[in-house]
Amino acid sequence: MSMYKHVKEAWKKPSESYVKGLQWARMQDWRKEPTVVRVEKPTRIDRARSLGYKAKQGVIVARVAVRRGGLRKPRPKHSKKPATMAMNKITMSKSIQRIAEERAAKRYPNLEVLNSYSVGEDGKRKWYEVILIDVNHPSIKNDSSYKNLCTGKHTNRVFRGLTSAGKKGRGLMNKGKGAEKVRPGIRANKKLGK
């Protein structure tokens, strides 16, 4: 079994492999860190490589912490009936992974988000590692696998739902029967697509 396959198998069931002990120690440090932290190398090298990561100049990885569960909605300031406040059980239309990608993009405004993957969770938070690309770096412009990100069509791609997590949330992973209202976009079909 190759090294990448070995890592992949271990992360399939982290609670039953050596990953559990590593995560227990890691998360004690992660909880004390800020929301967005740049990391030297990916925690899950197999997942990062499959999503387009390369150990070269112009490519960085950032770990982002996001809350778990439903939306933490602010309480209305003006008087309302408790029944109509709609405080609890409100779910965002955007996935937590997309929120993590957007936070990383705001922290590094000169970089574009390539992709992201999960690296752990506890009772309160989820952690994602986000791969970011510097589209103005010469080594990125000369790389055939990243060249299309430098054309200008992918500016602020994470805020337009063009990452893998964004397309999944917009329903673009489905096609055929049942996906008639998904394309070209949700708002183009009176929000009946999702």
UniProtKB/Swiss-Prot annotation:
Keywords: Ribonucleoprotein, Ribosomal protein. It comes from Methanococcus aeolicus (strain ATCC BAA-1280 / DSM 17508 / OCM 812 / Nankai-3). GO terms for biological process: cytoplasmic translation. One of its GO terms (cellular component) is cytosolic large ribosomal subunit. Residues 165-194 are annotated as: Disordered. Transmembrane segments: none annotated. One of its GO terms (molecular function) is structural constituent of ribosome. It comes from the Archaea. This is Large ribosomal subunit protein eL15. Belongs to the eukaryotic ribosomal protein eL15 family. The gene is rpl15e. PROSITE patterns: RIBOSOMAL_L15E.
